Structure formats: structure tokens, C-alpha cells
């Protein structure tokens, strides 16, 4: 049983609508320090939308968010959704909760090194020399230090995603969010990105991962949520859950019958 002091990231009763369509119907998640939580489910189940609600890239319509015991202050926006009440708090929140996107989202006009030092300098106020030294260490750690001075267009998809992970690590986040980080990659490049993610998990990084990689979910994560039509249909230990699914929809999903 988690106590409040154990929990690093908490999302409670998150609802989200697009027009009249409710896409998230009360999803909750509690991640302790060092947890690797995977979100699985078919396309359109709400996985990525929920992940984006955690740092307000999507504004939920109901729910509460807390990071390290600090609640994100929310107020009602004109469209009825919830927005951050305090812009500086949201900026700090997003640095504490770094995101790695499906399509890398590197800045095309910046070199690899410039991509990685941008947030430490301009968001965290780090001295440039310190940011560069840290960036070089991170690029070496993800195996792309030799690409520091090239532009994203000159990189393979796997290299771009590893740079994106280094960029996320550069702000020293408390939690890392991964939105299907391998789905845009050619199959032969998936392994190099999953290896970096496995290494991060081994270091005790807290990670929330939307993924279709069932092997990663089973072997690396310690908690798994199966989403279907905006609800958590089943959650628990991934090894147990993926080997002996309890609900029929998860059984169908794992057998390929639920698209």
C-alpha cells in the first residue's frame, strides 16, 4: 500500500473531453520513486491523451495532479477545461516532469548539442559552460556523443530519439514521460532506444511509458495499466497481468483481437 510520502507522481480521477466525446473517464495513477509504469491498450484507448494531461499539454476537464507532494494549482479555463493557475509553477512542473515524444520533437534549426543545452540554460538558468559539460556527458551516455555538432535531419530515427532522451535528462527531471518512444522507428532501430530506457530504469528513474512493446512492459516495468475506451480496465504487476489477464478485453488485446 502506497503512503502519500512514498508517491512521487499522483494523478487522480482524470477526465478529458474533445467536444462531446469523453476520451478519459476517471483515470488515476500513483507512481513511487523508481517505479516504471507502463500504459498499454489499443489505439484510441486514451493512453497518450492521459500522458499529455500529466504535464498539461492536454488540459483535463476534471481531476487533480501532484508531484512530490506538491499539488498543481488548476483553475477553470473558458472552454471548461482545467488550466494552470500559476504559469511559473507550470514551467517548473514541466522541467520536473520531462517528456519524450513519439516523433522526437527536436528543434531542426539547432545542432544536437544546442537541443540538449536549451532548457538547462533558458528554463533552469544554468551557466552555458556547465550546461555543455552536462550535455556532453548525457550524449555519451546514450551513445551519440560523436553527433553533437550535427543537425537532427542528419540523424537516424534511433539517434534522434536517443538525443531526445538526453534532452529530457538534461533538466534532471523527477519523472520521465515517454509517449510511444519507439513507434515511429524502423524495427531495426527499436532495440537501441529500448536499451537506453532499460538502463534508465536500472538506475532507478521514475518513468511513465506509453508503449506497444509488450516485452518492455513485462520485463522492465513494475506496474502496468491497460486502458480501453478511456478507462483502466485492468492494472497490476505486468508479469502476472500479461501472462494471466483477468479481463476479456485484455485477453483480446494480447491475442491481437482488439484493435
Q: What residue spans do the PLM features occupy?
A:
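C-terminal boundary and immediately downstream tail of ABC-type ATPase nucleotide-binding domains
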Residues: 226-229, 239-259
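ABC family nucleotide-binding domain
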Residues: 6-238
